[in-house]
Structures are given as structure tokens and as C-alpha cells.
Amino acid sequence: MATTFRSQTLSKDDVNYRMHFRMINEQQVEDITIQFFYKPHTISLLTVTVLSLMYFAFTRDDGDPDSNLRVGLILLVSFFLVISVLAFPNGPFTRPHPAIWRIVFGLSVLYFLFLVFIIFLNWDQVKALMFWLDPNLRYAKREADVMEYAVNCHVITWERILSHFDIFAFSHFWGWGMKALLIRSYGLCWTISITWELTELFFMHLLPNFAECWWDQVILDILLCNGGGIWLGMTVCRFLEMRTYHWASIKDIHSTTGKIKRAVLQFTPASWTYVRWLDPKSSLQRVMGVYLFMIIWQLTELNTFFLKHIFVFPACHALSWCRILFIGIITAPTVRQYYAYLTDTQCKRVGTQCWVFGAIAFLEALACIKFGQDLFSKTQILYVILWLVCLAFITFLCLYVMVWYAENYGPRQKSFSECEDSIYSEAGDSVTECKGEFEIDSTTSCSTRKRRDSGDSRTINGMEK
């Protein structure tokens, strides 16, 4: 019986789908100038890995069981990250190097697996693990047990107000500056800021440290710290949007100062994408997607406070601030991938980093619920329902205002192609502005035009060729 082989030809839609998904999940570096840093060195890496493993396995003293366990875990994480560099996708970013973002994705996978492991332990085992990591946690106390909140709110003095400008106020300001760089929308940033204060009110019966004086919550938090950070972040966004990005090869720069400057600029975005979460023609699915984005954002913020309250470690402990920094780093590619999924009709699935981030958020919440059953048994269901309703109302109101403003006062023709990436998209070493209403089909023509135009300029990013 003859066997018939049929050649399967991908349709144009399939090709576009794969191209669009690859742009956010496996961004490629274009116009590579120093081949050594981007060529695979798998054999060399394997050799170094095996030799280092042999060295640590046979030269160290294995008489201390505790030290054996710590060193073993450290090497396990290290070699998993080596595999991450070899096998995991780049994600949407390529600056300063794709390997950095593969390691970030590898760390997020490790944290996800760690949360899965934690969920299947009992409370005594979790506490024993925490005490093994840091014996000083045996003496840690909840902040709610040693501090008072929202006391004497009618007493308003300059001394009391100035006393609130501490390291946490600075972290609020700086944190909102970074959030604005990620979200790039005044409307969404202000909505998240306001709804978070409402979230604190609705969950105050569970977490006493959510209780704040009205002037602390409204003036210091919303207006000064959050508002100042949003303004700073959006100002930086506008500045980066107006720049024209032409990247010169470091080989074409002859001065030592120019080479050093180009090397430093490798740690800056390759381009900056104009972001528009909603427009007058947005579908209901897109609106609901933004609402889901708000819910997950609030859930991630809530996890920060519930984790340190249930597992009893202070805000200044390494477990707290390391998690905050880590979540902040993986949020960057997550938001980029979710934005592409939400706004690009050709992108039919979320990126892998976005998927892992969502799983982490829900696993953290699940761990809090499992090990904080005494706390959550006091939950007022009515408050939670009202919180969801208020969050939905404020979100939809904000979205309506954003669409109305864009329709009446927004730019008519201004838009940029999403063929590059930065904190949102980086397409490589040669970038510029491309006209169009987020039409990724024009990516090829835009990139060709950019490379042709960049060749006519003798000065690139302030460096003479």
C-alpha cells in the first residue's frame, strides 16, 4: 500500500501568529556587532559546569550536614539557571543581554516550584524551614502586635507629618515611579493608586497595619508619594518617547570615550514604545482584560502584606524586600507580554513569563489562605464583595474617561509600531519610530527603513562614528 505524504503549508494567519508570539516570547537581537557575546558557547559552558561541580563535590569538607544542604541547594539553583540560559526563551527584552532575561525567567520558574512545594508542607515544617534559613526569625513579631495604627488622627502637626517621610515613603515614591514606567498610562496608574487605598480600607479588618489616618492616606500616600512617583515616571516615559533611537556598532566608534559611553548605553532601552491600553474602538473583551489586570495587580500587592503577616517576618527582612525586588523585575516582561496579548489581535496566547507570573500570584494567595486559616476565618464576605464591586466601578469609570479623553483630546495620528522593545520592547541595536496604529505587519518595512536611515547619520546617540 502506497503511503501518501502531504506537505503542510502554513497559512498567512499561522505565520503572522507565530511571528507575533515570537516577538514577545523569543525576541531576537538584530544587527549584532560583537558576535562573541551572542554566539552559543554550549560546549565551553558544559566543560566549566562539570569541572566546577567536580571541584565542589570532592574538595570541600562534607562533615557538616547543614553546610552540605546549603551548598547543595545553592549549586542546584546555579545549575538550573545555567540550563535556563541554554534552553529558556529570551522574553520580550534583549537589553542588556538576552541571557539576563533568561535567568530572570529561570528564577521565576524556581520560585513557582518553591511555592508548589511549600503548599504541601504543614505549618510546623514551614516554620522549621524559615528558622533554618534565618534562626533570628524565631524571635520575630508581627508588626501589628508591637505597633499602633491610626492613633490620634485629629492631631496634625508639622513634626508628625515630617516623621512619616521615612524610608517607606521613599520606597512608595520610587516604587510608583517604576510602576509608571511599566504601565505608561496616567489613567491606569491613578486608578491603581486610588483603588489600592480602598483595598486597604476593605481589608483593614484582617490586617491592622492597613489602618491609617485620613491625612496620611490621602495627602501623603495618594497625592505626594504615589502622585509624585507617577508624575516622575510618566515624565521619563514622555522624554524617552520623543527620542530617536539610532544605535552605532561599538566597532565603528573610534574614540575611547565613545566606546565607553556606548557600552554604558547598552544598559538602557533600545527603543521606547508608545502605549495605548484603550481607544474608542476597544472591544468588551479588551475592557475586561484591563479589569483582570487590575485584579491581579491588587492581588500581588495584597500578597506582600499577607505573607509577612502570616509567616511573621518584618518588612525590613531580606525575605520581604528580596521578594519585592524580584516581583518588580519579573513584572516588566509580564506587563509587556500581557499588553501585547490584550491589544494585538494576532497574538492569541500570553507569553510564558506572563503565565508564570499569574501562577505565582495565585499560589502566593493560596499559601496565605492555607497557613492563615485562623486569620481568614474572620473575613467579612460582604467587604470582599464590595471591594470587587468598587474596584470594577472605579476601573470602568477610569476606562470610560480614558476613552473619552482619547476621542476628544488625544492625538489623531500619533502611534508607533511595536516592532521594538525596551522595558516594553527591544528589537535590537537599530531602532527608530514607525508610523501606524500598532500595525505589526509593517514591522519589516519599518526595520528596513530604519537601517537605511541610520546609515545617513554621522552622529549616533551623541557618539561620532
Swiss-Prot record:
Q: Which domain of life is it from?
A: Eukaryota
- Topological domains on the Lumenal side lie at 57-70, 124-286, 331-355, 402-465
Q: Which Pfam families match?
A: PSS
Coiled coil located at which positions?
none
> Which segment of the chain is annotated as a signal peptide?
none
Q: Which GO terms describe its molecular function?
A: L-serine-phosphatidylcholine phosphatidyltransferase activity; L-serine-phosphatidylethanolamine phosphatidyltransferase activity
Instruction: List where the protein spans the membrane.
Output: 36-56, 71-91, 103-123, 287-307, 310-330, 356-376, 381-401
Q: Could you tell me which cysteines form disulfide bridges? A: none
| Annotated pathway | Phospholipid metabolism; phosphatidylserine biosynthesis
- According to its UniProt record, the EC number is 2.7.8.29
Q: How does it sit in the membrane?
A: Multi-pass membrane protein
Gene Ontology annotations of biological process type: phosphatidylserine biosynthetic process
Q: Give positions of region: Disordered.
A: 446-465
Biological function: Catalyzes a base-exchange reaction in which the polar head group of phosphatidylethanolamine (PE) or phosphatidylcholine (PC) is replaced by L-serine. Catalyzes mainly the conversion of phosphatidylcholine but also converts, in vitro and to a lesser extent, phosphatidylethanolamine.
Recorded protein name is: Phosphatidylserine synthase 1
Protein source organism: Danio rerio
> What lineage does UniProt assign to this protein's organism?
Eukaryota, Metazoa, Chordata, Craniata, Vertebrata
- Gene that encodes it: ptdss1
